[in-house]
């Protein structure tokens, strides 16, 4: 009898430990899709799209659940009436919130909050510069000197934007956000700046395909 009680207790503890193991839950809302429409979870790996999971929309919402060993850049994708939406984020254990529409928003975990903040800042800066450029080019009342001054102001803002990019990468070079952003923006930095960032990459990311390619490029 005592042995049976012991075995039941051990089994209960094992079940609890299993249930408490790290997992992710992606809770999303989506605009423009009907009940039963399919949304895909995919990873872009070695030049190919790899389907990880799929789910259907119900009441404008969808959910993905599972477990993830390391934070990985993935995509939530759907197509409807010839329109395609693709939102990238970090699939990692934790509660991830997703809002898909004209402007995709993803957060809820440390990497995704940081990544979304970076995107918001970069998009806002880019929009401001584009608006300034279009306005200067379309305003027939401006003199050449005035247009030149606008272009100089845009160059200053561009420099500020790239400083923001560099600082974000540097601050996150030990996590998935920095590792994702560095290869994407490295070409915008001087070689010595690229090297300074690469030297700070932890060993756990040393074999990342994009990082390996970047290192080879820097060395040549």
Each language-model region and where it sits:
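Amphipathic alpha-helical coiled-coil segments
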Residues: 155-172, 192-196
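Short, structured interface segments
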Residues: 97-99, 104, 167, 208-219
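N-proximal helix/coil linker or "cap" segments that precede and/or mark the start of modular domains
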Residues: 192-220
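A non-transmembrane, solvent-exposed segment enriched in polar/low-complexity residues
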Residues: 18-163
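Bacterial Sec-dependent N-terminal signal peptides
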Residues: 1-29
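Amphipathic alpha-helical repeat scaffolds of TPR domains
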Residues: 130, 174-184
């Amino acid at each position: 009898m005592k042995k049976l009680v012991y075995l039941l207790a051990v089994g209960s503890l094992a079940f609890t430990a299993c249930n408490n193991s790290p997992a992710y839950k992606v809770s999303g809302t989506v605009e423009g899709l009907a009940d039963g429409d399919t949304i895909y979870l995919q990873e872009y790996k070695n030049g190919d799209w790899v389907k990880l999971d799929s789910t259907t929309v119900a009441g404008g919402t969808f959910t993905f659940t599972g477990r993830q060993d390391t934070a990985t850049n993935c995509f939530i994708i759907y197509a409807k009436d010839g329109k395609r939406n693709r939102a990238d984020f970090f699939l990692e254990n934790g509660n991830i919130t997703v809002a898909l529409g004209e402007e995709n928003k993803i957060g809820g975990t440390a990497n995704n909050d940081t990544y979304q903040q970076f995107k918001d800042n970069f998009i806002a800066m880019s929009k401001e510069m584009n608006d300034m450029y279009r306005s200067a080019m379309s305003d027939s009342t401006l003199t050449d000197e005035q247009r030149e001054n606008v272009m100089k102001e845009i160059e200053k803002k561009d420099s500020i934007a790239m400083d923001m990019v560099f600082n974000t990468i540097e601050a996150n070079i030990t996590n998935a956000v920095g590792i994702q952003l560095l290869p994407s923006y490295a070409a915008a930095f001087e070689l010595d700046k690229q090297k300074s960032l690469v030297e700070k990459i932890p060993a756990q990311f040393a074999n990342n395909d994009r990082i390996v390619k970047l290192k080879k490029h820097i060395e040549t």
